[in-house]
Curated annotation (Swiss-Prot):
PANTHER family for this protein: EPIDIDYMAL SECRETORY PROTEIN E3 ALPHA, EPIDIDYMAL SECRETORY PROTEIN E3-BETA
Name of the molecule in the record: Epididymal secretory protein E3-beta
Function of the protein: Possible function in sperm maturation.
Coiled coil regions in record: none
Signal peptide: 1-25
Cellular location(s): Secreted
SMART domains recorded: RNAse_Pc (SM00092)
Amino acid sequence: MASSLKIWGTLLALLCILCTLLVQSKEVSWREFMKQHYLSPSREFREYKCDVLMRENEALKDKSSHMFIYISWYKIEHICTSDNWMDRFRNAYVWVQNPLKVLKCHQENSKNSYTESRSFNYIEFHCSMDGYVDSIEDLKMVEPIGN
């Protein structure tokens, strides 16, 4: 009897550790996506500059081009939520219903500065197995945004 309790206790402890690792993996991919692509609406869209964004983010320093999206944190968090609100899309591609503001940065030949293009785009996001956005898959530009 005591040995079976030890086995069940060990299995329960291992299950708890596994669950913790799964939660942390979701947080890492979600956090990385937000760190690399998110522009907060707390500032005006025109205030964001590619040279500053690409220089400040360590993960983007060696990239020749990158894309940022200007959307509320709440909306990004709920992109992978189905109509049921209790369910999340898992390992699925989801197009947003309304166009979003996008800032694209392209490195120029001098490698010290970036050109910027701003536009409204429909965006297709990938929802991870955890049910949270982990990447941008496709864009359809609606119209450019003038400076």
